[in-house]
Amino acid sequence: KIVALDGNLDQVVESSWFIRKIGLPFNTFYVKEFAGVDPSSGNALYYKNTEDENGNLDRTLTQDVNEAQAVPYKQVDPKISGGLTNILSYKWFDLAFTLSYSLGGYSFDKTGTYIETDGASEGNRNLPIYELDRWQKPGDITDIPRFVLGRSDKVSGGSSRFVHSTDHLRLKNLTFGFTLPHNWTDKVLLDKVRVYFSGSNLLTWAKWKQYDPEVPVSGEVFCETPPMRTFSFGVEVNF
């Protein structure tokens, strides 16, 4: 957490969606709080979050993003992260794997501010697959507002709508091997022969599945390439 800032400052707002404030984690988002979609109109809803003289926030909903006040919201750094590596063997077989995990962190989807404007500026851009779940008729329950191509009321980029969890569990590495028995290798004058298969980034269980949870740079995602999934096969021979 931040314990002091330069001079007499108690907070500094950086870029469009970060705040440095005494008492808060260093990488804290500062955004207008998205409250879902109005089932009757399909418009985005926001909490006003205006502060009264006692410091209480007004949690009234509004469809006008300009009436909403940005507030500190979530943090980039996970509360818990780590990994587990295990090596198992039985007779001629061996198995090694590494799991990595992260819990409690968030990222800002900067790419989303370009491709999720609900029709305001998507004319020449690809849409994310989850736009298929957008609001389409009264009564629809979804968190994707209605799509109106060429709409004039552009979506606010500095909204918690674009803040997503980076919670995940990943099978980072896996190697499975088989060592030929000595009574086989002795016949061909070899000391050891091991055949193995290896892979990396094979499986990922993530709370937010639209981009890789390890991709964010300094809490932001902007078209970065995710870690590659790789496979390899090999033979080890000792004479």
Question: What are these model-derived regions, one by one?
Answer:
Residues 59, 76-80, 87, 168-170, ...:
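Conserved structured core elements
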Residues 3-8, 134-239:
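Membrane-interface anchoring segments and C-terminal beta-barrel signals
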Residues 80-95, 180-182, 236-239:
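Surface-exposed extracellular loop regions of Gram-negative outer-membrane beta-barrel proteins
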Residues 1-77, 85, 94-165:
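Surface-exposed, extracytoplasmic segments of Gram-negative outer-membrane nutrient-acquisition systems
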Residues 72-73, 82-85, 183-184, 221-222:
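Generic recognition of flexible, low-complexity loop/linker segments
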Residues 37, 91, 102, 181, ...:
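Residue-level marker of positions within ordered structural domains that often coincide
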